Amino acid sequence: MSDAPDALGSAGASTAPAAAQVPPGTRFVRCVVDGAPVWGVIDGTDVALIEPHPFTRFAPTGRRVAVEGLRLLAPVIPSKIVAVGKNYRDHAAEMGGEVPTEPLLFLKPSTALLGPGDPVALPVDVSDEISYEGEVAVVIGALLSRVTPEVAAAGVLGVTCANDLTMRDWQRRESQWFRAKGFDGSCPLGPAIATGLDLGALRVRTWVDGDLRQDGTTADLVFDIPTVLAEITRTTTLLPGDVVLTGTPAG
């Protein structure tokens, strides 16, 4: 179940959605305090706890905990994770394919989700060619159904980091990517949801064992983020707390 199961109101094509209004620069996290998951806002070296959650009107609880030593969880539990493939031209070329003429969409199940520090149990008995894909993940802040790109952008709560782990051998073997990209733990997410950033100017960098492997920017997307979101909502409603992975650069 999503952390924000109740719709915040529909978003018509000419009406801005009722997304939670938060100051730009806010960084939301989910963490474990006293053995239970809670929401908070990063404030310097502390997390200021809030209730109930960022997808509706929230308030500080008055309690603060130190970031150091805190167990951070995936910053949201979405009803669905939607992803777009081959959304960087250099990555499409790297994969030996043509640039899509429309967003290439697929789903990852909720069981793919992991927190930012959680270990990944790679299915090495199934695949010997498991690869990383660093991506910008968009966290939806309002119910979006059949909306324009402008309305879709206004319905974004913020962005976080994702790794769209992929079994390349299975991706080549099957035309549907559910098995290649939907295995348990294939979507590490977090650590924070950052608000107020320019969706068209986000840098994407991926390191593997200290080596920089990917370095791109959302300015190079084939389909920009508002366009991707609007395209999804033509057929599938996005709910508050849903996550959209926006593509990976070459590397």
PLM features per residue range, with description:
Residues 145-160:
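N-terminal accessory regions of nucleic-acid-interacting proteins
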Residues 2-7, 11, 71, 91, ...:
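Catalytic-pocket segment enriched in acidic/His residues
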Residues 33, 140, 246-249:
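Conserved "cap/hinge" positions at secondary-structure junctions
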Residues 1-104, 197:
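N-terminal non-catalytic cap/leader segment that marks the start of a structured domain
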Residues 23, 115, 131-133, 239:
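Residue-level recognition of short, solvent-exposed, well-ordered loop/turn junctions
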Residues 99-116, 132:
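Structural signature of FAD isoalloxazine-binding scaffolds in flavoprotein oxidoreductases
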